[in-house]
């Protein structure tokens, strides 16, 4: 089966400790790998102010996961994100073109 490139961004509650945030990131990465996806990159983008209140929260912790898979991994991931009380919002996007690999710059 053909693998596609996906990007999932989710927002965690701002009142979580750093340890809880790391546990949540690891939990969703494990869920993806167990479902057969290959995690390419995970970016912990930090705490940011939200444009509007979500569940009475003014700030959220943004996390982005880039991964490849055949598409069957999305439903279990989104179900877990939807049922989690620590996640405020999430969005999964299928990328049309795989982004280029980062090039090392010599100083």
UniProtKB/Swiss-Prot annotation:
Per the record's keyword annotation, is Ribosomal protein included, yes or no?
yes
The reply on keyword Cell cycle is no
Q: Which SUPFAM superfamilies match?
A: Ribosomal protein S6
Q: Which GO terms describe its cellular component?
A: cytoplasm; ribonucleoprotein complex; ribosome
What are this entry's molecular-function GO terms? Answer: small ribosomal subunit rRNA binding; structural constituent of ribosome
Which GO BP annotation is one of this protein's? translation
What keywords were assigned to this record? Ribonucleoprotein, Ribosomal protein, RNA-binding, rRNA-binding
Report the function annotation for this chain: Binds together with bS18 to 16S ribosomal RNA.
Which HAMAP family would you find in this protein's record? Answer: Ribosomal_bS6
NCBIfam families cross-referenced by the UniProt entry: S6 (TIGR00166)
Protein family according to the UniProt entry: Belongs to the bacterial ribosomal protein bS6 family.
Spell out the PANTHER family in the cross-references.
MITOCHONDRIAL 28S RIBOSOMAL PROTEIN S6, SMALL RIBOSOMAL SUBUNIT PROTEIN BS6M
Q: What is this protein called?
A: Small ribosomal subunit protein bS6
């Amino acid at each position: 089966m053909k693998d596609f490139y996906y990007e999932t961004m989710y927002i965690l509650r701002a009142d979580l400790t750093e340890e809880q945030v790391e546990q949540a990131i690891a939990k969703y990465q494990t869920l993806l790998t167990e479902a057969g996806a290959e995690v390419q990159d995970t970016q912990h983008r930090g705490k940011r102010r939200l444009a509007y209140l979500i569940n009475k929260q003014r700030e959220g912790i943004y996390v982005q996961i880039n991964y490849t898979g055949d598409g069957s991994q999305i439903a279990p991931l989104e179900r877990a994100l939807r049922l989690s009380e620590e996640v405020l919002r999430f969005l999964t996007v299928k990328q049309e073109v795989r982004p280029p690999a980062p090039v090392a710059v010599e100083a």
